[in-house]
């Protein structure tokens, strides 16, 4: 049985210990110790990592998990049973996890006390934490929740833990949450004058250690809300990143940080106006270009053929332009536009032409080395840019004219 020193002092980061067993594992070796400061993966909190040092060497502990009767330390190299070691955890990692977890207790208590929202899920990753509440909260309630939790943290309330011998011993405690299926001893973490909750993880000694609590996101989740939060140094890093981003924007717009939102909105409005003007101008240019294309239509049998290279026309504008280029008489339109890397093409015909555009597109694909398809009156495709494109286009134009003349 391993003595769990982290339950006695959450700020203890090293201890002397003896290796009880060492067995090969899939990714190294699994060690058990007679006592440890390493917290395992449990209670929604990630495990500690660190080092085991001994005369003549050291091994890295990459993780720790709980089994039925022991804590298993995952090490990169073996340490013989009976070896005396000094176990040391990554203090920064542990303190970060304690800040987030104690902050989660505080946020969950405030949500329950103020809005009756029950925490039904908690997850802590290396980048953020999430709390799942069983009812939705609006923007004003979220601000109130964040403010209340920060005010309690600033009061530097004591955080204590106590173990109870049975479920019956918990009667009378103001428990916010009681995890199911717990076996004795049952550990309860209490924040002075606030939260009381069963929990197996190490926590901050006082709420002042949490630092700032910041809600970064809130999304609807199973009829409730999933909150994403940051505490302590994570919140500081987030605030610094956001401040620096706003600072860069302020310099970009040559304005003060407090005016960035207005400057961005002004640019967005100007961009929207410019896009509207561009669309209007583009429509006029397309109409003019379509008129030129219709004027250049050539008779081929009973129909007219409009075939042209229209470089500079965007791919998304090619089909609308082809539709505008249709004449009053039966017409087949073949347009091709090339940029630096790709050739886009479209085949479009009016009713009565008597040809299937999907079939003709296969001939274009073969001639240009492209891919595309369609059926009936419309087909389109694309191909890599290649030498001799103008010659290939001229040959395709002749082929289409020949097909039109042969159509009945």
Model features per residue range: what roles?
Residues 248-340, 349:
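Hydrophobic helix-and-loop "lid/oligomerization" segment in the mid-to-C-terminal part
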Residues 93, 113-224:
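Functional cores that coordinate and move charged inorganic groups
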Residues 204, 208, 216-263:
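A conserved active-site cap/scaffold subdomain adjacent to cofactor or substrate pockets
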Residues 43, 105-107, 131, 201, ...:
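Divalent metal-coordination and catalytic microenvironments
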Residues 1-83:
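Conserved nucleotide-binding/hydrolysis modules and their immediate coupling elements
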Residues 198-210, 233, 304-408:
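Glycine-rich, acidic loop segments that terminate in or are immediately followed by a histidine
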Residues 37-52, 80-131, 377:
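Active/ligand-binding-proximal structured segments within catalytic/core domains
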């Amino acid at each position: 049985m391993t003595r769990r020193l982290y339950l006695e002092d959450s700020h203890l980061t090293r201890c002397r210990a003896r290796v009880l067993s060492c067995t090969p594992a899939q990714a190294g070796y699994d060690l058990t110790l007679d006592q440890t400061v390493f917290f395992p993966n449990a209670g929604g909190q990630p495990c500690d990592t660190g080092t085991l040092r001994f005369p003549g060497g050291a091994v890295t502990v990459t993780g720790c998990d709980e089994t039925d009767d022991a804590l298993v330390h995952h090490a990169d190299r073996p340490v013989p049973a009976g070896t005396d070691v000094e176990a040391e955890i990554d203090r920064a990692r542990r303190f970060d996890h304690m800040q987030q977890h104690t902050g989660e207790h505080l946020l969950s208590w405030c949500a329950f006390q103020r809005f009756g929202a029950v925490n039904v899920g908690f997850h802590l990753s290396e980048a953020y934490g999430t709390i799942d509440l069983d009812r939705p909260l609006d923007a004003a309630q979220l601000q109130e929740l964040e403010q209340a939790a920060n005010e309690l943290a600033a009061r530097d309330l004591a955080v204590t833990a106590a173990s109870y011998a049975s479920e019956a011993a918990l009667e009378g405690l103001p428990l916010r949450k009681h995890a199911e299926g717990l076996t004795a001893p049952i550990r309860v973490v209490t924040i002075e004058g606030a939260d009381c909750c069963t929990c197996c993880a190490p926590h901050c000694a006082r709420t002042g250690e949490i630092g700032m609590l910041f809600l970064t996101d809130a999304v609807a989740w199973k009829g409730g809300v999933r909150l994403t939060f940051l505490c302590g140094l994570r919140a500081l890093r987030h605030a610094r990143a956001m401040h620096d981003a706003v600072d860069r924007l302020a310099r970009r717009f040559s304005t003060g940080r407090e005016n960035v939102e207005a400057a961005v909105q002004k640019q967005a409005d100007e961009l929207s106006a410019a896009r509207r003007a561009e669309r209007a101008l583009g429509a006029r240019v397309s109409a003019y270009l379509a008129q030129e294309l219709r004027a250049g239509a050539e008779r081929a049998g009973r129909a007219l053929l409009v075939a042209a290279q229209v470089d500079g026309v965007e791919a998304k504008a090619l089909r609308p332009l082809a539709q505008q280029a249709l004449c009053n008489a039966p017409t087949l339109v073949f347009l091709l536009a090339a940029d630096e890397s790709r050739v886009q093409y479209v085949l479009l015909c009016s009713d009565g032409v008597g040809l299937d555009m999907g079939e003709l597109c296969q001939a274009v694909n073969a001639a240009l080395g492209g891919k595309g398809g369609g059926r009936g009156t419309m087909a389109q495709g694309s191909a890599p840019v290649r030498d001799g494109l103008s010659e290939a286009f001229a040959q395709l134009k002749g082929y289409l004219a020949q097909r039109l003349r042969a159509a009945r």
